[in-house]
Every structure is written in C-alpha cells, then in structure tokens.
C-alpha cells in the first residue's frame, strides 16, 4: 500500500493466509513497542494501545477469519486510574459481577473499596475481603443515609448504588452536596408501595420521579459532581444500542440511495455530527422497542411458592406490577385503552392504568418474533427525550414511541403466572439462577422501526457459556448490567464535574468500546419485520380485531388484546 493508500502490489492466493497472519502479528508487536515508550504517560499509553489493538483485531477478524490471534486481556483492556475511594451500596448478583470487571478496568487499591449490605453472603464476600476490600453490614435508611455514607465516602470519591429502594433524589442530593460521584441503575423511592393503592396512575410512573429530579436539580447553583442515573443494561446500554442503530440505518439508507437531494445531505450531516434527534426524524423512525428475550434454562425447575429469575426478583416485581409506561410518538393517532397523559413537564410519555406485566406487545429479536411485556423502564423516558425535536417555541415537532418489550426466561414467566394467582403477593421463596443454568442466552437490543429499511435491531446476544468465561458463577443477564456499570464509572472518573446525566448524555462509542468484549455477539442487522407481517387469521371475519392495516407503526398494531386471537 502506497502513501495515498493505493495498492502497489498483489499477494498471491497461495501466500494470502501466511502474509496476513504475519502482518497482524507485526502490527500487534509494533503497537506494544510504540506504546511502551517512556515518552507517553502510562494512562494514555494504555488507552491508545487498547484503541489500536482493538481496531486491528476487529479489522482482521472481519476480513480474514483465519487470522485469529488471541490478545492478552491486559493488552486490550481500556483502563483508568482512580486514587480515591469506591463504595458499593448493595452486594447482590449485579454487584458481585461488577466488582471483578471493575478491577480489570479501574486501577485502584482494593483497600480503597468498601461494600455495604444488610444481608451478607460470606461465600461471595470472602475472596474480596482476602484481597483487602472492606465489608460493613449495614443498611441505608431514610433516617441514617447521611450518617452512613459520610463514614465511607467524601469529596472526589465514587458511590455505586446497586441496592434497591433507596430514594434517588435524597442520595443524589447528598452526593451533590458532598462532592461524591454517583451511579445507579434505576431511579427509586424508599417505599414504592406507600400510597400506591390510591395514587393516580401518573404518580406511579418513572416520568413522575424524573420530574421530581428535575425540580430538585433546578434549585442547584452549580451542576456539581457527575451522577450517572439508570446506567445498567436497560436502561443504560439500550440507549447506546439505539444510537448505533441510527448511525447504521443512515449509512445503509445513504448507500442504497433511499433518500435524495437536500434530505440526503441533511441525513449525512446529522450522521456526521451525531445529532441523533434530527437524524431519527429525517430517517422517519416511528417506534423503538427495547426488545429482550431471555432463553436461559436450568437443571432446577421452578417449584411451587417460588419466584425464579435471572436478576433481582424484588426489582422485577416492583416494576412489573405498576403502570405500563411508554414514550408516546407524534405519529400515533389514538390513545390505547386505560391511557393517561401527564399534565406537567415535556409531556413526552403516557402511562396505562394497567400493570406492565399484564400489557403484552409483539416485538422482534434476531431471529424471533416475541411476545413482550411493557414493563416500566427508564429508557422509555430518556430515549424519548433525547430523540424529541422541538421548535423555537418549545412545541414538539417529532417524537418516536419508545417502550420495553420484555420476554423473560421460562422460569420467570411461570413465576409471574403464580404471582397473579397470589394477587401479586410475592412468593415466600425467591431464587436467582446462576450455576444451575445449563443453556441459553440473554438477547437484548434496540428494535428501531418505521424507516425505509422497515426495521433494524442492534444489541447483544450473550450466551451463558460466554458470560461464565468472563466472570464465573454469573449469568448473561447480570453480565450485561455489570459491564455497563463499569463503563459508566470509567466515564465519570474521566469526567468528574458533569452534574446529573442519563445514559443518552454519554458518548455511545466510548461505552460500547468498553462493553463489546463482554456482550457476546454484537449484532446490528436490518429486518423486514412489522407487527402485521404475520397475523393470525383464526376467526377471521368474526372478531374484527382493532388494527390499522394502513399504518403498521400504530401502537394498536403491537398491542396484543383478546380480539386478536
């Protein structure tokens, strides 16, 4: 290859494999030599080496499948240094998966890490205590939050909140006032069931909680330390999958000349500048699903009076038994039954006076049509807000419909049926599947629909075998959450004064560069799927299903009701 990238020679087919394997080895050795130079500081050297080696590895793998050379983890792992303290609040399954990954990517003395949990698991804690991590048996409550936290973190430290039912406004406010970096995976309350029985449906939503956060933040005089909220797998990674999908859709549409003239020029410009809201609008995106199918199975079937899941049972029950919630697109012609609109804020969402676990929609993951539940999730708020286009007067010109479509593992589905029979009172025994899992995967991604290519899915297909190779005794579901937590922590360490941020405010390429090695098969693929592609004709002509055949992207076409049998 010459100076201007022109081809100056031809490699014979006989030597093709040998030459490219040796060339790859040469590039890797060159990168090691270059970035061990003392003229480059350690952190920059490691991150530049990571970027170059990851690029080379991916480039060769895509073009020459025979040229697979395993790179040592310490060579290709992006890493940051953190000299302050880290506090884990909660040490459930996600935290247990997060800690070993965190120590691969964040250089910190284990003695600077403290774990707080009110139900210690000695077997899970022992190896970390032996390495110098401190464990404290305690519980963060409304009457002790400040007293507990100030013992373990102060200005410049990092608090990773992986507990449940800690009021987000209170703990974010405390961290803001004390200069502490903060991360969580969901916006929660002290007691989500308090007053829930008689509350208006809109007051049970994440939208309502986010409006409370906005009111609190508006009173601050400075944005303060970085606090990244709702950065797990979903919400979290799903926002970055959505951005990547939009870029890939734009590339494919431009290459295939689906747009022309000034519109094509605008799309190319928005793609270049990552102006995602205008890009989605110009592409014609109507609907975005966070579509997930969990196929993990185990040798220990669910028993009577037992709730089995691959992640937090209490968390699933809490979000599944409250209102279904979704971002509401400007293309929608009518509200669904039991729908309520919000009266304050951007009014970008609606909720249903119907449990999310009992609200079913058709969706798609590669290569399955699934029946998913519209469980309340933070991405329905954050993605909708990020992709909204407003005029100078603040009126919304464009907004897609966004919601979760969750098909959990078989054991969880059986647990939900039993939960309904118990009038939503949680079973006396709960279990999160780990070592007993024998097969399956967690398939999680953004299904972006309504553009000229019909549908596009971007996300992770992570098998139980792959997740165990990365962190033993964990499952695919917790792995996707854990690596997202670590990536966000690294971004916070490098950007410590950004105030409150949602996943959509973080650079998607930064997060995905770190996360991809932990996500199994990273897929970005087009599909011709629509909710009307394959519809049942049972009782055709006698039940008159409420669908809109002229516009497949209306919510009524996704919603599964009794009249669609």
List each language-model region with its residue ranges.
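A short, basic/flexible loop-to-alpha-helix module at the beginning of a structural domain
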Residues: 68-83
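C-terminal catalytic/substrate-binding lobe primarily of soluble NAD(P)-dependent oxidoreductases
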Residues: 248-565
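Rossmann-fold NAD(P)-binding glycine/threonine-rich loop
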Residues: 172, 186-223
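Short linear motifs in low-complexity or flexible loops
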Residues: 8, 12, 20, 31, ...
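Conserved N-terminal Rossmann-fold NAD(P)-binding element of oxidoreductases
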Residues: 87-90
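Rossmann-fold cofactor-recognition segment
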Residues: 130-142
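NAD(P)-binding Rossmann-fold cofactor-contacting core
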Residues: 110-127
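Hydrophobic/small residue at the entry helix of a nucleotide-binding pocket
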Residues: 94
């Amino acid at each position: 290859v010459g100076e201007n990238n022109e081809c100056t020679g031809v490699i014979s087919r006989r030597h093709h494999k040998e030459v490219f394997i040796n060339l790859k080895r040469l590039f890797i050795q060159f990168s090691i030599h270059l970035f061990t130079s003392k003229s480059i500081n350690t952190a920059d050297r490691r991150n530049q080496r990571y970027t170059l080696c990851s690029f080379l590895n991916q480039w060769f793998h895509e073009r020459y499948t025979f040229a697979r050379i395993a790179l040592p983890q310490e060579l290709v792992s992006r890493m940051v240094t953190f000299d302050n303290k880290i506090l884990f609040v909660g040490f459930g399954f996600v935290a247990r998966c997060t800690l070993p990954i965190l120590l691969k990517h964040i250089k910190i003395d284990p003695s600077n890490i403290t774990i707080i949990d009110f139900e210690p698991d000695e077997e899970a804690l022992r190896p970390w205590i032996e390495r110098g991590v401190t464990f404290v048996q305690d519980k963060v409550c409304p009457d002790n939050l400040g007293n507990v936290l100030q013992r373990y973190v102060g200005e410049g430290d990092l608090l990773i909140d992986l507990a449940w039912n800690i009021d987000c406004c209170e703990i974010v406010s405390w961290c803001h006032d004390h200069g502490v970096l903060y991360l969580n995976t969901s916006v929660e309350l002290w007691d989500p069931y308090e007053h829930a029985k008689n509350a208006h449906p809109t007051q049970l939503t994440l939208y309502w909680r986010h409006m409370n956060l906005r009111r609190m933040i508006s009173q601050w005089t400075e944005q303060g330390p970085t606090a990244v909220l709702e950065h797990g797998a979903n919400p979290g990674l799903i926002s970055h999958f959505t951005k990547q999908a939009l870029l890939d859709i734009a590339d494919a549409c431009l290459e295939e000349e689906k747009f022309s003239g000034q519109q094509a020029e605008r799309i190319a410009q928005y793609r270049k500048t990552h102006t995602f809201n205008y890009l989605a609008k110009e592409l014609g995106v109507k609907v975005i699903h966070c579509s997930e199918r969990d196929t993990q199975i185990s040798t220990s079937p669910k028993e009577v009076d037992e709730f089995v899941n691959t992640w937090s049972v209490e968390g699933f029950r809490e979000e599944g038994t409250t209102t279904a919630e979704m971002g509401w697109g400007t293309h929608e012609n009518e509200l669904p039954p039991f729908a309520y609109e919000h009266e304050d804020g951007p009014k970008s969402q609606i909720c249903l006076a119907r449990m999310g676990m009992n609200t079913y929609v058709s969706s798609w993951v590669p290569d399955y049509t699934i029946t998913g539940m519209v469980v309340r999730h933070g991405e329905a708020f954050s993605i909708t807000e990020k992709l909204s286009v407003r005029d100078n007067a603040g009126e919304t010109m464009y907004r897609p419909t966004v919601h979760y479509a969750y098909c959990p593992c078989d054991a969880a589905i059986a647990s939900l049926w039993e939960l309904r029979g118990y009038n939503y009172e949680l079973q006396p025994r709960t279990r999160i599947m780990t070592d007993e899992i024998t097969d399956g995967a967690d398939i999680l991604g953004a299904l972006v629909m309504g553009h000229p290519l019909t549908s596009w899915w971007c996300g992770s297909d992570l098998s139980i075998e792959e997740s165990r190779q990365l962190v033993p005794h964990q499952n695919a579901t917790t792995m996707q959450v854990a690596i997202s937590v670590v990536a966000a922590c690294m971004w916070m360490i490098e950007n410590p004064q950004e105030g409150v941020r949602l996943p959509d405010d973080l650079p998607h390429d930064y997060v995905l560069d770190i996360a991809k090695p932990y996500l199994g098969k990273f897929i970005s693929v087009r599909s011709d799927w629509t909710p009307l592609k394959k519809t049942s004709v049972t009782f055709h002509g006698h039940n008159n299903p409420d669908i809109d055949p002229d516009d497949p992207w209306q919510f009524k076409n996704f919603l599964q009701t009794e009249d669609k049998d």
